[in-house]
Structures are given as structure tokens and as C-alpha cells.
């Protein structure tokens, strides 16, 4: 266990003092009625910190809830945050909170994160509160309007994540025709990546009941690391018909990514064992300093991925107190080439000599999702109820082939070797049917309010049914679980100050004991029962004007599988526990200066394990302390000009489960500027951003045990938008 250092404590006090005051479908989430367009001033009143954070969040089975009335830790980053930071993907948006750790490199085609010590993979990102409908790999911001992060497991709000993530729920909200818009944009990144796009929205009809929004983007060129060339394109359509009683939506997106000549890398420091070859492990076993963030260890790589989606949804209000809703959607995803597995292993820590190899994988997925529900409001005496009943359905069918590999090739951590003879495999197996999974759940919620909203209670439960088939191994598995939840919000002094407590659970599929994962197990073929992760949380929230201040304390307990060393049976009574404290503050210090800051302390450890020496150790990739500070200043003497800065600090984190290797702490500084003016009567906004201003060389996090993630080097981005 690490100690809470004096340096960390000093940083905490300082920040606390400063924080005083594709084709895409929207399912049956509540959509804002749009009888009239909102002015910018009205929109700002619905947000914190000069429009960067939303005051309301869309929370799946609970509907739309204000942040102050939600008994969980939830943050929604708005379109303004996305545009001012020029974030290209959801993962780049999440960098506003350093406690959300990336477990894949910046710029990787697969974006995975860690929240509160537990992973959230890209397969478990969702669109508009539902799983299975997000693009493969990563979500480009060109198709979305906001990003909501609900920290910790929450089966009540979102159901069981199909890949088993329990660290949190990452929900992207798609674009909607909220107001008339005709926008053309262009951007340039250092090394020659150019991108252009358009975004057009209209409200039509006598009462503005019809909405249309169409957008697209295309980018191509070298960026992020030396020689890596990307070609990216998106297209999105959103249609809606909105009246006081009826809401109908149609959405579609298409996303394409093509990558050549490079990929960000994970670097392995693997302890040697008798079973490993010299090219598969590290000697002497120690950590090396990080190389330059723009190093390219895979110059002959190629990969591409695509996603497309269609769907429709509707909602009808029979009265102000009763409504029904339904939705359905279809998603196709595929990838081919060397998309992931971009890893090298350091063989000699004295010289930096390393080895790696190229892979080729293939994957296709078809997913269907649907929901049906109703919501009614009624009173029982002095208690106001909002009762919800909802059914959700998701099926995922996918095909894949085993990875084809090339021969291992030599390289060097500090001097990557370029050898044209080392190429990706040219032959590979045929894609075959692999998995057919079905998830059905039923949710019942009762949101109660009494004493003029001074006391609010959420009671809920989700019944989850799981049916999985491995078509390749010809195995089947079915199980079900009930996940109860309880939330309490108390406002004894003011409607702007709340205290809350909650208990929620998260569900993950039980592990299947196979020859590959447990070759010596005595219970091969058995699938363990679904894991129930439990979270207990206490907190307080205070809002005043543009300010939101939050404080949360939590504990998460997650069961884990392990193999008993005596019986050789695979069991599921190991446990990882995470405890932490999180503080955030956001608002306007003055009319011209806004702030977003956050602090987090986490103690994540293995409390039960099949390896006795591991008990009490810190979970890999979980820094004890993270801190972030973002400032945005409007320069009074230059109308339309503003500058912004963001500093992120991450303390030390362990690379392996025995805690013998530790990644150093680091601080990253990002700078930006924006200038809004009119050119020829056209509203024009120029933006410039520099990430990692000081070009730090650092290990940003942990991909998996013994694999460090190489942090991105300094990058530049220039952008301009024209609003006609």
C-alpha cells in the first residue's frame, strides 16, 4: 500500500482553495420539447461553468434528472466542452477528469478507460443510455452532442454491460436539431492531418415540430506518431417530430476508420520464467524511462474498422402524468487488420532491445436492441411518486477468426527499427460464427419525493436474464440475477444543497473455464455465475449560480475468478475492493474567468486472492491521487478572444500485481485559444490547441499486468468554423 505523500497533500489543499465558490438511433429516452428555439443566454442557465457542464443528465431507466437530485456521481460534458478542446473522440473528452484513466493509448483505434479502479471497455460505451449501439473501437465526437459519465457500477440505470464493465457507465448523447444551424468546419493537426466537415440543422413546421439535422466529416493525413496515416469519415442523420404529446425520432450514423504505417504502442516488461523464450520476457527485470511519445514501433501496420446504425423510437403522453415509449435499432460493426495487440516486449533493459510482431484479426458483429416502457406519476398522501416499468432487449451475433501472426521482429525502445521485410500476415483464417448472446432485462423504479422535495428516495430493481452461446466451441450458458438499488437525497437547508447516499450493483458475465485460460483446471467447461459488484456511496452537492461543487465517498466490491492451487478448481470468491474520495468544483470565478477542477484519492487493493502474496497489494494502474485544473479566460480588451489551460497530475501507479514495478508520477499541461468574430457577415470561430505543451516523456497508465502505455507527445491542432 502506498502512502499519501506530503506533495500530494499540498497539491490537494492548493486546488481546494482555488475551487471555492455513422448511422445512429435515439432510443426511448426523454427528448426535450422544442416549441421555440433557446437563446444562448437561456442555454447557459441550464449549464455550469460557462456552459461546459450540463445541470441535467439523461440516466436511462431513471429518465432525465438534475445533477443536484441524483444520488450518484454523474457529470455531463456539453458540446461547448467538446468544441473548445477540439476533442475528436469520447476518450479525449474524458481527459477533463484525470481520475478517469486511459487503459489504451491516446489515438488508439480502441479506447478503453478505468474508472474507480475498474475497467470500462469500448464495447460497453453506449449511445443514449443503451448498450450495443455505439461504433466499434471508439466514438467520434462528430456524431454526438454530449458525454455523460456515471461513476461506479449501475445496473439500475443502464443494465448489464455486454462485456462486463463495472467501473462506470459512459453514455454519449447524439446530436439533435435543437436550433437552426449551418456550419462548415476545417482543422489541421501537426504532421499533416487535415479534416473538414459540415453540420446543418433546421426546425420546420408552423410550431417547429419537425427537426432535421445532417452532418458529415472527412479527415486524412499523418498525426499523433511519426509516419502514422489515418483516414476517417463520419455521416449522421437525425430526424424528429416533436409535439406536446408525441415524439418520434429516426437516427442513423456511419463511421469509417482506416489506419496505415503505424499505431500507438503498449510496452511490456515481462518477468522471465522457464516457459518463456528470451524474446518473450525482460531481463534485468526493471522499468525503463519512457521514450518519445511520437515513437513508431509498427511502421508496416494496416487496419480498418467501420460501423453503421439505423433505428427509430417514439414516445406518447396520454396525460401530463402518464406516458409510454418504445424503440428499436440495428447496428453492424466490423474490423480487419492489426487493430489491437500493438505491443512490444522489452528484452534487455540495459540496451532497450525489444521484440514484437504483426497480427491480423477479423471481426463482424450484428446487434439488435429494443425497449418498451411506461412511466406514471401519482400521489399517495404527501408522497409524490414517479413509477417506471421498462423492458430492454439486446442481442449480439458476431463472427471472427483467430489471429494470424508474423514472425517476431527486433526493435529498440529508444531507436525503433524500420525493416520493410517485416510485414503483416498476408493469409489468415476464414471468419466463422463465434458468439450469439442475448440480454433481456426488466426494470421497476419508484422515484419518491416528499416534504417539498426536501426528501427524495429512489427504489429500484432490475431483473437480468443472460443467454450466451459460443458457436465455435459449441457451448451454451443461461443465468439470471436480480439487482436491487436504493438512493436517498436530502435537502434540509436549501434546494441547492443536497446530501445523498446510495447502494447500487453491477453485473458481469461469469467466467467460462477453458483450456486456454485455465489449462489445468478440474472444472473445465463450467461457466461461473454472474458476478455482482456492489457500490456504496455517500456524498454532497452544492450549486449556486454557475457553480457546482461535489464531494463523494465510495466503496466498490467486485468478485474475481481464480484457480485454487490445491484443488485446481476455478472459483469466484476472490475480491477486489476500491475505496475513494472525489471532489470537484466548476463555475465562473468572474464574468470572464471560469474554472473546472477535480481531485481524487483512491485505495484499490486485492483483498482476496488465489495468490496469498497478492492480498493487500494495490490494483495495477490505479494512482493513489489525481488532480485536474482547467481555466478559461475571456480577454476583455479583445472582443471574442479567450484562452484556456488545463493541468493534469497523476501520481505513481503499479505496473504489476506483485507491486514490484511502479510507473512515475507525471504532470501534463494543455493550452488553447479561441477567437470568435465576423468575416463578411459570417460568424467565424478560430481555435488553436496544444496538448502536452512541454512534450513530457511519460508512461500514462497500464494496459494490463506488466504492460505500460506510452503517453502521447506534444500535438498541435488548428481549427476554424463558419456559421452561416
Model-derived segments and spans:
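Outer-membrane beta-barrel translocator/receptor signature
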Residues: 142-145, 156-235, 241-247, 308, ...
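Membrane-embedded beta-barrel scaffold of Gram-negative outer-membrane proteins
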Residues: 314-329, 333-341, 499, 529-608, ...
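Gram-negative outer-membrane beta-barrel transporters
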Residues: 450-454, 553-557, 572-657, 694, ...
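Acidic/polar loop-and-plug regions of large Gram-negative outer-membrane beta-barrel proteins
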Residues: 219-223, 231, 236-317, 332-365, ...
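Surface-exposed extracellular loop regions of Gram-negative outer-membrane beta-barrel proteins
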Residues: 258-272, 395-400, 490-537, 542, ...
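Structural signature of Gram-negative outer-membrane beta-barrels, strongest in the C-terminal barrel
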Residues: 365, 380, 384-396, 433-558, ...
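Conserved C-terminal beta-signal and adjacent last beta-strands/turns
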Residues: 12, 386-387, 489, 501, ...
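Acidic, small-polar-rich N-terminal luminal/periplasmic segments of exported/outer-membrane proteins
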Residues: 34-180, 538
Amino acid at each position: 500500500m502506498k502512502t499519501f505523500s506530503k506533495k500530494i497533500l499540498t497539491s490537494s489543499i492548493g486546488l481546494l482553495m482555488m475551487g471555492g465558490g455513422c448511422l445512429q438511433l435515439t432510443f426511448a429516452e426523454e427528448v426535450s420539447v422544442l416549441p421555440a428555439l433557446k437563446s444562448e443566454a437561456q442555454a447557459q442557465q441550464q449549464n455550469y461553468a460557462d456552459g461546459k457542464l450540463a445541470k441535467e443528465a439523461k440516466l436511462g431507466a431513471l429518465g432525465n434528472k438534475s445533477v443536484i437530485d441524483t444520488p450518484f456521481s454523474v457529470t455531463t460534458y456539453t458540446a461547448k466542452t467538446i468544441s473548445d478542446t477540439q476533442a475528436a473522440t469520447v476518450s479525449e473528452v474524458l481527459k477533463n477528469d484525470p481520475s478517469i484513466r486511459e487503459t489504451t493509448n491516446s489515438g488508439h483505434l480502441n479506447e478503453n478507460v478505468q474508472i474507480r479502479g475498474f475497467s470500462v471497455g469500448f464495447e460497453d460505451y453506449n449511445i443514449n443510455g443503451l448498450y450495443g449501439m455505439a461504433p466499434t473501437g471508439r466514438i467520434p465526437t462528430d456524431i454526438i452532442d454530449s458525454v455523460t459519465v456515471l461513476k461506479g457500477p449501475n445496473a439500475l440505470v443502464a443494465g448489464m454491460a455486454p462485456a462486463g464493465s463495472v467501473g462506470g457507465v459512459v453514455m454519449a448523447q447524439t446530436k439533435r436539431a435543437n436550433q437552426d444551424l449551418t456550419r462548415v468546419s476545417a482543422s489541421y493537426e501537426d504532421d499533416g492531418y487535415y479534416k473538414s466537415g459540415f453540420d446543418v440543422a433546421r426546425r420546420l413546421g408552423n410550431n417547429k415540430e419537425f427537426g432535421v439535422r445532417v452532418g458529415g466529416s472527412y479527415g486524412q493525413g499523418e498525426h499523433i506518431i511519426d509516419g502514422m496515416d489515418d483516414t476517417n469519415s463520419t455521416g449522421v442523420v437525425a430526424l424528429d417530430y416533436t409535439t406536446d404529446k408525441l415524439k418520434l425520432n429516426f437516427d442513423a450514423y456511419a463511421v469509417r476508420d482506416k489506419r496505415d504505417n503505424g499505431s500507438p504502442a503498449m510496452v511490456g516488461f515481462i518477468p522471465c520464467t522457464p516457459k518463456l523464450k528470451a524474446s518473450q520476457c525482460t531481463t534485468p527485470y526493471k522499468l525503463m524511462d519512457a521514450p518519445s511519445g511520437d515513437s513508431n514501433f509498427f511502421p508496416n501496420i494496416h487496419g480498418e474498422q467501420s460501423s453503421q446504425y439505423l433505428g427509430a423510437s417514439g414516445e406518447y403522453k396520454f396525460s401530463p402524468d402518464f406516458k409510454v415509449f418504445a424503440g428499436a435499432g440495428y447496428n453492424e460493426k466490423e474490423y480487419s487488420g492489426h487493430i489491437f495487440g500493438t505491443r512490444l516486449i522489452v528484452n534487455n533493459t540495459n540496451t532497450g532491445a525489444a521484440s514484437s510482431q504483426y497480427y491480423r484479426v477479423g471481426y463482424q458483429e450484428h446487434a439488435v436492441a429494443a425497449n418498451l416502457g411506461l412511466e406514471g406519476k401519482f400521489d399517495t398522501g404527501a408522497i409524490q411518486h414517479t413509477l417506471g416499468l421498462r423492458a430492454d432487449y439486446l442481442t449480439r451475433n458476431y463472427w471472427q477468426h483467430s489471429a494470424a501472426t508474423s514472425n517476431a521482429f527486433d526493435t529498440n525502445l529508444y531507436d525503433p527499427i524500420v525493416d520493410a521485410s517485416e510485414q503483416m500476415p498476408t493469409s489468415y483464417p476464414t471468419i466463422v460464427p463465434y458468439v450469439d448472446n442475448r440480454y433481456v432485462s426488466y426494470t421497476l423504479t419508484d422515484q419518491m419525493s416528499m416534504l417539498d422535495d426536501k426528501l427524495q428516495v429512489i427504489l429500484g430493481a432490475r431483473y437480468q436474464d443472460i443467454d450466451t452461446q459460443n458457436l465455435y466451441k459449441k457451448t451454451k450458458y443461461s443465468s439470471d440475477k436480480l439487482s436491487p438499488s436504493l438512493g436517498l437525497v436530502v435537502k434540509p437547508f436549501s434546494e441547492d444543497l443536497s446530501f445523498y447516499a446510495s447502494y447500487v450493483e453491477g453485473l458481469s458475465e461469469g467466467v467460462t473455464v477453458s483450456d486456454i485460460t485455465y489449462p489445468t483446471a478440474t472444472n473445465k467447461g463450467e461457466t461461473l455465475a454472474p458476478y455482482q459488484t456492489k457500490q456504496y456511496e455517500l456524498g454532497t452537492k452544492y450549486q449556486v449560480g454557475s457553480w457546482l461543487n461535489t464531494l463523494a465517498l465510495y466503496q466498490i466490491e467486485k468478485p474475481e475468478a481464480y484457480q485454487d492451487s490445491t484443488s485446481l478448481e476455478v472459483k469466484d470468491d476472490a475480491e477486489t475492493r476500491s475505496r475513494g474520495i472525489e471532489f470537484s468544483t466548476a463555475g465562473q470565478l468572474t464574468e470572464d474567468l471560469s474554472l473546472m477542477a477535480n481531485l481524487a484519492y483512491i485505495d484499490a487493493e486485492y483483498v482476496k486472492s488465489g495468490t496469498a502474496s497478492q492480498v493487500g497489494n494495490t490494483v495495477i494502474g490505479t494512482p493513489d491521487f489525481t488532480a485536474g485544473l482547467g481555466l478559461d479566460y475571456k480577454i476583455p480588451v479583445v472582443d471574442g478572444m479567450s484562452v484556456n489551460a488545463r493541468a493534469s497530475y497523476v501520481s505513481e501507479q503499479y505496473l504489476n500485481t506483485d507491486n514490484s514495478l511502479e510507473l512515475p508520477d507525471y504532470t501534463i499541461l494543455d493550452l488553447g485559444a479561441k477567437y470568435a468574430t465576423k468575416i463578411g457577415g459570417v460568424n467565424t470561430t478560430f481555435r488553436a490547441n496544444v496538448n502536452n505543451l512541454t512534450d513530457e516523456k511519460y508512461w500514462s497508465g497500464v494496459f494490463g499486468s506488466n504492460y505500460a502505455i506510452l503517453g502521447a507527445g506534444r500535438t498541435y491542432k488548428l481549427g476554424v468554423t463558419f456559421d452561416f
